[in-house]
């Protein structure tokens, strides 16, 4: 289901990503949720939710990287 606010995000996202990365995750998830509503638009047998989470993480990884300190940092 789409997320209305950052506070609605899963704990595994809220506790590891900085605020801006959470915004990216939320927007990408919501967009993918709409885009991949039809099963034939998804790869493999992934559910709509699984697909949306994969897209959201890919969007975050496009702008952020996990550092040696195990924290997410904006790429320069």
Swiss-Prot record:
Listed name of the protein: Putative cation transport regulator ChaB
Top-level taxon in the UniProt lineage: Bacteria
Keywords (A to Z) from UniProt: Transcription, Transcription regulation
Entry keyword annotation includes Acetylation: no
Species this chain originates from: Escherichia coli O157:H7
Subunit structure of this chain's protein: Monomer.
Source lineage: Bacteria, Pseudomonadati, Pseudomonadota, Gammaproteobacteria, Enterobacterales
Task of the protein: Might be a regulator of the sodium-potassium/proton antiporter ChaA.
Keyword Transcription found: yes
Cysteine disulfide links: none
Family: Belongs to the ChaB family.
UniProt cross-references to NCBIfam families, sorted A to Z: PRK09582.1
InterPro entries: ChaB, ChaB_sf
């Amino acid at each position: 289901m789409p997320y209305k606010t950052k506070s609605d995000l899963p704990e595994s996202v809220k506790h590891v990503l900085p605020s801006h990365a959470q915004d990216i995750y939320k927007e990408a998830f919501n967009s993918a949720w709409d885009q991949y509503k039809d099963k034939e638009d998804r790869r493999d047998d992934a559910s709509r939710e699984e697909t949306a989470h994969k897209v959201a993480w890919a969007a975050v990884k496009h702008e952020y990287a996990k550092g040696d300190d195990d924290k997410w940092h904006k790429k320069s």
